[in-house]
Amino acid sequence: SDVCSSDLNFATQTDKLELGGSARYNYQDGDIASIGSTEDFLPDGNSYSNSNSRQRNKAKNFNADFRMEWKPDSMTNIIFRPNFSYGKTDNLSNSESGTFNSDPYSLVSDPNNWLNLEKILNPDDDPLRSIRINAINSGSLNDNKSVSTDATLQLNRKLNDKGRNVTFRGRFGYTNNDNNQYTESETHYFQLLNALGGDSILVRNQYITTPTKNYNYSAQLTYSEPIARATFLQFSYQFQYKYSESDKTTYDLQGFPDWGLSTQLPTGYEEHAVDSLGKYAEYRYYNHDASVSLRFIREKYQLSAGMSFQPQHSVLSYKRGDYMIDTTRNVFNFAPNLDLRIRFSKVSQLRMTYRGRSSQPSMENLLPIVDNSNPQNVRIGNPGLKPSFTHNMRFFYNTYNAEKQRGIMSHVNFSATQNSISNSRVYNSETGGWTTTPKNINGNWNAFGMFGFNTALPNKKYTINSFSNANYQNNVAYLTSGKGADAVERKNTTTNLTLGERLNAAYRNDWFEFGLNGSISYSIEKDKLTPDNNQEPYTFSYGANTQISMPWNMTLSTNIANQSRRGYTDSSMNRNELIWNAQLSQTFLKGNATVSFEMYDILKKQSNISRSLTASGRSVYEYNGVNSYCMLHFIYRLNIFGSKAARDKMQGRRGFGGPGFGPGHGPGGFGGRRPF
């Protein structure tokens, strides 16, 4: 992959006026390959699928922003922030996939080698023919152009020095997007016979254009009133208008045998629009948000409690094929919140928060229509969908002893959703496709907890760091077996408990640093309806790192770690990877200039793998990546932006904000940049 970027920033300020802005250009050219396997849970025997894909993605992006802050007097503050962006992408992709009625790994070691149609059309040469349901080979070309702009104006006026103030915030945004997609696909159905008794074949050559336009504006007024000592009552009202329009048109190019992805659109293609595969949708949203909150500020604690009321009026004009409708919807959402901070000392605090949020299903999900633009994933609307409500609670505690250089941090999070929207899927065993209908379901929740401990030993040269975490997910979904009147829908529950631990020990002096580290992550995955799907995969790693500082301002750093996976059904996932990185840097010109040479994954062993588990199935994907590479840096520090405040304005106040817990406390894992 190739990446090229350039940035231009400026910042200046006077006593009353601050100006800043930036312009950025970015170009990316990436070649992405992936192989994957998916297991869909079914009451009467699971469905299995494998896929290979290759993509070439090119993207050009330009963004410019400006910031002006004016303080005409000590009581008034005015901020204006406009932004503009332009983007262009070109993507070429090719994919091969296949669906099977039993586990293909029971017959061959690598089913992904048996997905190309040219290789498997001869039954005598196909070891998976007895379990094969479909095979799909496709290619697509996408080009997209987008232009967007937005601006925010904020005026704040202090009415006295007791905390009474009023704030106005206005915003406008506009986006125009033009997307064109060209596709070729060939699907063979091995369980569905044609009129001649052979395998059914579906060939689709299409050109799809989808221009979209969006704009919005909003105005918000906030008033804060001190009602007692260090006690404030705040009122806020916001009105927002949003407009969205999309017009999808699909042209059938099957009647043009000379057309391909590498050729121009044929003459006369405009006469072959398929009305049933097109869609026009125009949304108009009129949103109101009125909130009230009460805030107490005391020496030892801060408490904020409030409620937001959100009446919404929506209008939809919709057309798909012969189906046309103009419909409106009026809903009422509400969102309570609570935030408590208890300060035990300057370096020790406990924070507890609660957030509640109600949300509505999309208007298109409520329409009683059938969307068969993708024959492998047919979608049906559900007018009976109810709104969902999500509860989220967080607890956070941290403390630090500067004398002993000892820190403790803990965090607990719990989230649950009532009437969450789940996809009820009906499987077609003849085609390997799905018919999906959104439905409300209860039982989705998750809990997460972590504990971190960092301390120096008495001589301060040795440090120990421990990070422990636990995550539990309870996912529910509807699984359907049978067809028509014989269809039976059942509720499935999958649970995933993941326990992790990372331990680091380090020695440091003025010129030398050496550390040892180890980590383990263990998962217990259970499926209620089909216990045979249960797995207990785990990963572990161990390694060392060192850094040597030379008297002539040269630094040598290196780290090495052995990372391992175990417990996966696919034996190719159970592997060891020895990862070695190194860096050499030299500082000169009185510390203002640094040149460094970095080498990542020197042994070329690292892989990129992602996994997901839901109540309806699990999937594993492996991606190619430029993990083994070198980088040469030259950094020269200039102080031409004046004060630190001016530099912060130039950077848009970006950053992590606040002190960190300490080096090396995060959990270990696979993939991602490996810092020195």
Model-derived segments and their meaning:
Residues 1, 6-676:
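Primarily recognizes Gram-negative and organellar outer-membrane beta-barrels
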